[in-house]
């Protein structure tokens, strides 16, 4: 194994749309070590517990479980993989969706309109400890935490 391969960030993908997952994984596979994927809450928690990815791309609206979607996955996965960082990747830019996963501990939130290059950059940034938000969401997040 080359030095470059050993340095790849371990990434998992959670989304209930198989074709979307496949497309994202195809985009990311040259840059990251894709260690797992899942489509629902119970499968996601199990996959994260088993693979212990460094970063999870997490859709907000995922079926199963108790109806909490991405926030529920994050909360239930934490005990099994406490160092995993979560980056929400969703079509939704609704304040309640953004707030739910950020309050649950996600390191960032980007929308599915993101380019492949920007998604790769966002994954690297959250892995390094930075918070990442789509430009459209950054103002909302700031105003929420500033009490505006």
Predicted features by range, described:
Residues 59-61, 90:
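Active-site residues of response regulator receiver
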Residues 96-103, 108-148:
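Short, flexible helix-to-coil linker/hinge segments that flank and couple to helix-turn-helix
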Residues 9, 18-36:
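Two-component/phosphorelay signaling modules centered on CheY-like receiver
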Residues 16, 89-93, 112-114:
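Conserved active-site segment of CheY-like receiver
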Residues 46, 67-83:
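Short amphipathic alpha-helix used as the core "switch/output" element in two-component signaling
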Residues 32-41, 47:
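Short hydrophobic/Thr-rich beta-strand motif most characteristic of the beta2 strand and flanking loop
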């Amino acid at each position: 194994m080359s030095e470059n391969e050993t340095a790849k960030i371990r990434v998992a993908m959670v989304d209930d749309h198989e074709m979307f997952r496949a497309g994202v994984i195809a985009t990311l596979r040259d840059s990251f070590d894709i260690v797992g994927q899942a489509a629902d809450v119970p499968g996601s928690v199990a996959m994260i517990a088993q693979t212990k990815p460094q970063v999870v791309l997490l859709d907000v609206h995922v079926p199963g479980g108790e109806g909490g979607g991405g926030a529920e996955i994050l909360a239930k996965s934490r005990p099994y993989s406490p160092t995993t960082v979560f980056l929400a990747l969703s079509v939704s830019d609704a304040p309640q969706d953004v707030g739910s996963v950020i309050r649950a501990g996600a390191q960032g939130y980007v929308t599915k309109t993101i380019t492949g290059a920007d998604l790769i950059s966002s994954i690297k940034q959250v892995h390094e400890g930075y918070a990442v938000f789509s430009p459209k969401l950054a103002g909302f997040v700031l105003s929420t935490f500033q009490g505006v």
